[in-house]
């Protein structure tokens, strides 16, 4: 293969992975709180209401649409774990009632404690996302299990791969999917 052919091959590979964030998981906790047996549903139907967070901000920087993106990504992880989902608004105090009204058996609340989009591929500063997931029976929201997840983008990988600026929500993959699966395991 000549030099031009190798160059085209390398650029094609870079093009395939552009816009993808490479996460460095900085913190994740195993499920804590009420045991999974205590939050089992009495029905065979398992529908998880995913309470989408509001749009995120970091200082003066606002990220329109980020709440929906995070909610959709969490829904995808729940579906990959074998559950059905329905999206609801994450209104404080009203989520459980809305979930029951929509026929949900479980409520999954998302609390984002940090969201920072620094255009890592261009700025050299890592993107960050930190969130907590809280799972409870829709009819008994006080009996909950929860996990935490924190990740930042890998600066070296982002410098080569993130040409189109992946968003912090792109850091929710791999270990995140496994963590959501662990949270949901045995909760049916």
Show which residues each predicted segment covers.
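Second-shell loop/turn segments in exported
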Residues: 56-65, 120-121, 159-166
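Short secondary-structure boundary motifs at beta->alpha junctions and helix caps
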Residues: 138-188
